[in-house]
């Protein structure tokens, strides 16, 4: 195969433009005009040969990006694509047993790997051509779940897509979308998959609505010897403010607070300064007695306290000063 078969000719500048290492996300105006010219002149498969074998693949990419479904239909249905297997970027599993490229799988892979706002149109296009939407590890429904498109997920299920494929992977993809998650659970997904992955993930992304939903369904909130609560308590200040806003205290009531150590409890006092949470943890049995040992005064500190008391300072004022100092040091 000649080098020219991987190029298209720019008649205006009288030179060939290579498409071999071309990246579809960076179509220049010049390439766009050339693609428009090609599109207007497609009357037979021979036209692709004139412009180069590799042009087929990139023209397909371009049609997907531009949502040009009419031309996409022409490319997929009317012309053989056997020559595109010479393109090294097409994986072997995209080639059917007869040596032809699986175009539908290629399209699904392409929209999965690229952020395409109109992907729903393309999925509908594939459905309209009666393809096996559950094939290739159910990539179509995984795309819809990742894009948080519940209506498309339901439609794909109606067409035979398996919402439970790959060990309920769709459920794990939906941990940041409570509505999608609830739908998949209603379809029979296992909320305990992969050692309670869902409740762990919900904790890490601070999805408290999902946390409460999972607890109500029977997930073990004390999983990992207090992993959930320790993760929340050790969160940075921004997320800790979110805790109060999302009423996570209802969840804390069911947690064994004895899993918290001095590090977490010190964070509550000095870093987060969340008085509601400190009170709640104390009411539910958190052990703050480490402070007694931590705050044992040496001779110098006792002398300082005595001097301050003799000058009329109250214990409350001295304590407030110490707390402010500790807060500053943190």
Curated annotation (Swiss-Prot):
| UniProt keyword Protease present | no
- Pfam families the record matches: Ank_2
Q: Identify the keywords attached in UniProt to this record, alphabetized.
A: ANK repeat, Repeat
Spans of repeat ANK: 55-84, 103-135, 136-165, 167-193, 195-223, 260-290
**Entry annotated with the keyword Repeat:** yes
Instruction: Write down the SMART domains for this protein, in alphabetical order.
Output: ANK
The source's superkingdom equals Viruses
- What name appears for this protein in its UniProt entry? Putative ankyrin repeat protein L121
Q: Which organism was this protein described from?
A: Acanthamoeba polyphaga mimivirus
């Amino acid at each position: 195969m000649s080098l020219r078969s991987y190029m298209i000719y720019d008649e205006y500048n009288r030179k060939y433009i290579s498409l071999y290492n071309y990246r579809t996300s960076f179509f220049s105006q010049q390439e766009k005009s050339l693609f428009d010219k090609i599109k207007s002149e497609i009357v037979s498969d021979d036209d692709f040969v004139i412009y180069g074998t590799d042009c087929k693949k990139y023209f397909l990419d371009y049609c997907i990006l531009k949502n040009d479904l009419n031309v996409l239909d022409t490319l997929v249905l009317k012309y053989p694509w056997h020559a595109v297997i010479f393109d090294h970027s097409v994986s072997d599993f995209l080639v059917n047993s007869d040596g032809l490229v699986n175009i539908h799988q290629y399209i699904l892979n392409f929209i999965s790997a690229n952020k395409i706002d109109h992907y729903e149109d393309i999925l509908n296009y594939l459905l309209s051509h009666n393809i096996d939407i559950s094939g290739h590890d159910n990539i179509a429904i995984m795309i819809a779940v990742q894009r948080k498109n519940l209506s498309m997920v339901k439609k794909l299920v109606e067409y035979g897509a398996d919402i439970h494929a790959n060990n309920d992977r769709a459920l794990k993809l939906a941990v940041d979308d409570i509505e999608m998650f609830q739908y998949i659970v209603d379809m029979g997904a296992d909320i305990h998959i992969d050692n309670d992955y869902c409740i762990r993930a919900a904790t890490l992304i601070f999805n408290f609505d999902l946390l409460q939903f999972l607890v109500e369904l029977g997930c073990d909130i004390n999983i990992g010897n207090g992993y959930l609560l320790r993760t929340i308590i050790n969160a940075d200040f921004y997320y800790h403010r979110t805790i109060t806003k999302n009423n996570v205290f209802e969840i804390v009531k069911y947690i064994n607070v004895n899993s918290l150590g001095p590090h977490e409890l010190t964070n509550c006092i000095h870093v987060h300064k969340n008085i509601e949470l400190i009170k709640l943890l104390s009411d539910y049995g958190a052990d703050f007695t480490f402070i007694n040992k931590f705050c044992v005064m040496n001779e110098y500190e006792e002398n300082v306290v005595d001097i301050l008391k003799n000058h009329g300072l109250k214990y409350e004022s001295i304590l407030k000063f110490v707390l402010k100092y500790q807060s500053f040091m943190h």
